[in-house]
């Protein structure tokens, strides 16, 4: 069984077109994920959810919810949530909590 934490970003392996989902509720046997890009919510059995944790790598480019592009310099994980240390196109460094990643990212092969 996968470990879920409210606020984590996941994708549905069966429905990549939903974009990035966010854990909004965890029950004993189920996990609820909202997919803001489509406005849909799914409830999955925790034991066999077709979900893949989204975890970008150093050097990857990601998009914030406001559309800014950032290059990942490092990442830290605390209590199951990732904060990316990034550099914007002007060379300024900022911290980007995973919850502020663009909801419209669509992944073909999750990292």
Predicted regions: what they are:
Residues 29-43:
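Short, basic/aromatic beta-hairpin or loop at an interaction surface
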Residues 18-26, 68-78:
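Short beta-strand-centered aromatic/proline hotspots
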Residues 13-16, 24-26, 36, 65:
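A short, compositionally biased micro-patch
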Residues 19, 29-33, 80-85:
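Short aromatic-glycine-enriched beta-strand elements
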Residues 39-67, 79-81, 87-111:
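Intrinsically disordered, low-complexity, charged/polar segments
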Residues 1-14, 54-73:
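Short coil-to-beta transition motif at edge beta-strands of beta-rich domains
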Residues 7-11, 23-25, 30:
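Generic alpha-helical hydrophobic packing signal
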């Amino acid at each position: 069984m996968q470990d879920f934490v409210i606020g984590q970003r996941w994708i549905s392996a069966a429905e990549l077109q939903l974009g990035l989902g966010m854990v909004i509720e965890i029950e004993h046997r189920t996990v609820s994920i909202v997919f803001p890009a489509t406005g849909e919510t799914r409830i999955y059995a925790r034991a066999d959810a077709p979900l893949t944790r989204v975890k970008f790598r150093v050097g990857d480019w990601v998009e914030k919810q406001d559309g800014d592009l950032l290059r990942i310099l490092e990442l830290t994980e605390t209590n199951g949530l990732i904060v990316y240390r990034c550099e914007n196109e002007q060379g300024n460094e900022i911290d980007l909590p995973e919850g502020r990643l663009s909801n419209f990212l669509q992944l073909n092969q999750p990292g």
